[in-house]
Amino acid sequence: MHLFKIISFIFFSSIIFAQNYSLESVDDCAACHDEIVQQWQTSMHALSTLDQDVLYRGMYEWAKEDTKGKITKKCKNCHTPYFYLSDTMLVNKEDRKRPVDCLYCHSIDSLHLEPKFSPMKYAANDNSLSDYHTIQGRDHFENEKLCMQCHAELINPNQVAICTTGDEFYNQSENKSKCQSCHMPNVKGYKSSESDSVSNVHTHAFLGPHNEEFLKGSVKISGKVNGNTLTITIDNSKTPHSFPTGTPLRMVLLKVIGLDRNGKIVYQNWQKNPVNEDKQALFARMFMDEKGNMPSPPWRAVKVGNESRLKPGEVRKITYKLSDAVSKISAKLFFQLAPVPILNKLKIDDPYLRKAHLIDEIEMELN
């Protein structure tokens, strides 16, 4: 990924720069930006390390054992971006364990062919009024380019694209919303302790699927019945990337239940496993290994075996045949951060990871 180039460039390019650069802590930032740091502390950026992210740790240890450690450096590029900094120049062993934090993102000067870091602080706009440090404005804080350093793509050793958010975004032309519009929306607050008044500030909670409220309504569903045919419409028109996106562990499930006049369940589109019972109700990206096994761990993949996610901007219609006994329909769309069998294998009991999170739901009376 591009991030490795970023890190390599900065920390191996200038000994003079390294000698003058110090790694401030998040606590230093909190002295003036307490409100923003509190938001960040709830984010997955703050929890990106092996110590804090139980799913990342489980997948990392599995990949490490399965590949004899050959691919784990790719994981650390983004989860602990200080990892690749030179021992002799900048970062001690403890700092190498730091998550994606204030200093890392706000020290990025430019994102051209060779991204450049600097001890200067950067943000969306210039600010020379601070007593503590000067801030220079950079465009990449107001577009997708900074985010895409980690969220664009991940290629496995077999040259199979594992994460494809960047391609999804750049290959669609209908919606060019910037990442920050949804994942860092404006909230009322103080930019720093020096601020005289409340203003609109981009939240640094970095909203995503680990925030249940953020998930709700991110994709909408609706239904229509014509005779004995039920059509469920799933609307991803507001999203400029596939849904779900990011790690291929994520999946979206559609559950349809039909009730008779007495409230008894007389129809279900699937009961135990949509992969076997109703493939059109599963929205996911699955990989196949060289032996034809699917799903395959991402690092073993030789090709994509199934791609059923909602495309950027897609509105998909799914039909079901109902019996005359069905009097009422309930349809729910759920988001799961990882398949339960994977969580079982990794011995992860985290309730949020195991929960099917409701995105949207409808109920329809048929007669």
Regions found by a protein language model. Name each.
Residues 18-173:
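Sequence context of c-type cytochrome heme-c attachment sites
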Residues 15, 37, 102, 144-147, ...:
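A generic alpha-helix preference that emphasizes hydrophobic side chains
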Residues 16-19, 367:
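N-terminal intrinsically disordered, low-complexity tails enriched in polar/charged
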Residues 155, 173-176, 180-181, 185-367:
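Short, conserved sequence motifs used for protein processing/export or organelle targeting and
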Residues 7, 28-32, 195-196:
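Alpha-helical interaction segments
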